[in-house]
């Protein structure tokens, strides 16, 4: 069984103005999903995640998160927590570690 997951050296997804890499760890644990996301400008479409809480840890850079209409600045070392059902977007040049609880699936997401 694999317990250590290396960051893949190529992107596994791209959408809007973000690109990222998923850690393929579901076989070991399907309770949380992890991805590293990079963006030059942010994610301008508003998102509502119906089933997952999103936890974004800012690895590099700075920007803003708008969560349920409230805008807050963030920078390297900060953690943004978005509860399921909240509407959010983010802007700025950042590298983020995303943890979703439970495991994220595309059909759970609405964009505006």
Q: Positions of the model-derived regions?
A:
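Ligand-binding loop in jelly-roll beta-barrel domains
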Residues: 84-109
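A short beta-loop-beta micro-motif enriched in histidine and acidic residues
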Residues: 25-33, 39-57, 67-68
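A short, N-terminal "cap"/entry segment at the start of jelly-roll beta-barrel domains
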Residues: 1-36, 46, 111-112
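Short acidic-glycine-tyrosine-enriched beta hairpin
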Residues: 68-85
């Amino acid at each position: 069984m694999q317990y250590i997951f290396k960051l893949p050296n190529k992107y596994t997804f791209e959408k809007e103005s973000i690109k990222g890499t998923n850690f393929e760890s579901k076989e070991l644990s399907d309770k949380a999903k992890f991805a590293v996301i990079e963006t030059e400008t942010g994610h301008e479409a508003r998102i509502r995640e119906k089933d997952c809480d999103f936890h974004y840890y800012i690895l590099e850079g700075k920007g803003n998160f708008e969560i349920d209409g409230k805008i807050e600045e963030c920078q390297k070392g900060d953690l943004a927590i978005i509860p399921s059902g909240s509407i959010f977007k983010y802007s700025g040049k950042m590298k983020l570690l995303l943890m979703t609880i439970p495991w994220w699936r595309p059909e759970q997401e609405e964009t505006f």
